[in-house]
Amino acid sequence: MLPRYDLPNAAPPPLREVQLLLNSEDLENEIDWLPDWLAERGLARAERRARALRAALRALVRANNGTPLDDEAVATVNAAARRVSIQVDASGAVRVATDGDALDQVVAIALGAMLDGSWGRLKACRHCRWTFYDRSPNRSGTWCSMQLCGNRKKTRAYRKRRSAAR
């Protein structure tokens, strides 16, 4: 069963669909929901492609935290982007579109977010590596959730200070 997003770190639609793919694996607890994600979208046979795309998009998200981009991730996303088109709608707005499957839709959403600037708000938690949407005004968020990883970090710091004072 896929994790759901009712937490404050959930990206707004449609970027939430990208976040769902990226978080289809819990790296900290070694749980992989990718087969469920694919089955829900009728793509059970696209697992290899999905794993490559998920890894590449994660690398792009880590770049939002300051990690250098790797060439393989860029090449994977660029290859997937060939199934996506840039269009101008009747109002003159530019949008990214595809008639492809759910993975192509994820690529279109990600590229659209890069164009509109919202991509920079998707980040990887420095503790658990979960992808979260940074809602802080200055885009300085570092944890997936203050209740989870933020609390863990602060508790460790408190214990360290306390043991040093003894």
PLM feature spans:
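Short helix-coil boundary/hinge micro-motifs
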Residues: 1-133
